[in-house]
């Protein structure tokens, strides 16, 4: 646990901060710069900064990872506070602040997840990833509920304090644990993308990210005032099933868990496409979406890219796996102006169709949990059952 504690603090602090900072920053942009063109431009600058930061960070951070992660967390706290400078009269200043904000997210996220992967063994990575994401999910939920009574300036200051707190804890824990040695191999992006196993997992993940964020504004339109409550319940379900998904990923393999997640998503959107006017379909959607997100968070987001990296440095794998999800967050901004022209049932039907189609590459994808580890677990379970049977009749 001593080895793993710094990774938990780092990932928990970073992902909670990222989720709430992005949401709060988006609210500030929408309130301050309501003009459609400028609004889309500023959102785009922020997400562009994330992409630029992630690509740059994957090259730079492995050289002195722990030190750079500390600098990154300090940068995050400063930029969080500086976001209050955004206003409708100085768009150039807004652009500078937002590209800095995007880079303050992107620079260290791949290294944070790579750090997590390097502190876990492949046979336990899913379980640890699930437990970590459960903590993240409940952390976001608790923090978000606490922030509801705060105005935007106070929210930004609270997030800055949260970031500094994580920095101090990570600094102390890394000094207690000692330096973590990095894998020596540094693969190129081209070599990674030419790998068949990476492509077969990356394509469905891209498809999921596009569908998820494209459908998000449509779901808000359908659920109306119930959206906030549904989001809270879904976060709680995700928090529970992240741990379940992680444990299952270590027991039966990552591939089966991921395929199950896509099947669940396909079913929930099919239900909405047929019965979105019935409240019961909302309950089904909330339950299924929470389960699917739990499975994906622990396995697809936290575990899979570390598995695929094997003995290589893992930052670039997490960049390729993380960017589709991070950049797809820009899609709701583009979709909102066209909500009135979108037929809800058609949108949900298309989403369901492509989510089922996304399973096809996964069928041909290799299992990333070594077969030997699965056999060892099965043999261990068989021996334990045999002992219990023997004790029962002796």
Give residue spans per PLM region:
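Juxtamembrane intracellular "pre-TM" segments in multi-pass secondary transporters
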Residues: 1, 175-204, 377-394
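Helix-loop boundary and gating motifs at the non-cytosolic
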Residues: 1-51, 196-230
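Helix-to-loop junctions at the C-terminal end of transmembrane segments
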Residues: 52-67, 241-254
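C-terminal ends and interior cores of transmembrane alpha-helices
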Residues: 75-90, 263-277
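Symmetry-related core transmembrane helices of the 12-TM Major Facilitator Superfamily/SLC fold
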Residues: 155-175, 345-364
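A late C-terminal transmembrane helix in Major Facilitator Superfamily
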Residues: 311-340
């Amino acid at each position: 646990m001593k080895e793993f504690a710094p990774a938990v603090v780092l990932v928990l602090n970073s992902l909670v901060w990222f989720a709430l900072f992005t949401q709060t920053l988006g609210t500030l942009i929408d309130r301050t710069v309501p003009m459609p063109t400028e609004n889309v431009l500023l959102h785009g600058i922020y997400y562009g900064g994330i992409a630029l930061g992630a690509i740059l960070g994957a090259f730079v951070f492995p050289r002195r990872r722990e030190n750079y992660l500390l600098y990154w967390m300090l940068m995050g706290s400063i930029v969080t506070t500086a976001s209050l400078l955004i206003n409708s009269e100085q768009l150039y200043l807004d652009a500078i602040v937002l590209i800095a904000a995007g880079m303050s997210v992107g620079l260290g996220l791949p290294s944070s997840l790579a750090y997590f992967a390097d502190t876990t063994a492949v046979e336990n990575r899913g379980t640890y990833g699930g437990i970590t994401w459960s903590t993240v999910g409940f952390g976001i939920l608790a923090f978000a509920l606490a922030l509801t009574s705060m105005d935007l300036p106070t929210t930004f200051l609270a997030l800055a304090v949260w970031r500094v707190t994580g920095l101090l804890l990570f600094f102390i824990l890394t000094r207690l644990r000692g330096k973590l040695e990095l894998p020596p191999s540094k693969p190129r992006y081209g070599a990674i993308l030419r790998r068949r196993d990476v492509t077969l997992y990356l394509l469905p993940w891209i498809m999921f990210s596009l569908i998820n964020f494209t459908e998000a504004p449509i779901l808000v339109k359908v659920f109306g005032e119930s959206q906030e409550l549904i989001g809270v319940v879904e976060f709680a379900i995700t928090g529970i099933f992240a741990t379940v998904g992680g444990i299952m990923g270590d027991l039966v393999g990552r591939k089966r868990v991921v395929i199950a997640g896509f099947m669940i998503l396909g079913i929930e959107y099919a239900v909405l496409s047929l019965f979105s006017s019935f409240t019961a379909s909302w309950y089904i959607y909330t339950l299924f979406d929470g389960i699917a997100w739990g499975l994906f968070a622990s396995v697809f987001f936290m575990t899979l890219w570390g598995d695929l990296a094997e003995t290589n440095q893992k930052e670039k794998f997490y960049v390729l796996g993380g960017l589709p999800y991070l950049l797809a967050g820009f899609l709701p901004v583009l979709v909102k102006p066209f909500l009135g022209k979108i037929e809800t049932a058609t949108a949900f039907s298309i989403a369901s169709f492509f989510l089922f189609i996304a399973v096809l590459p996964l069928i041909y994808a290799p299992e990333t949990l070594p077969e030997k580890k699965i056999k060892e677990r099965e043999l261990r379970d068989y021996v334990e059952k045999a002992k219990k049977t023997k004790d029962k009749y002796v």
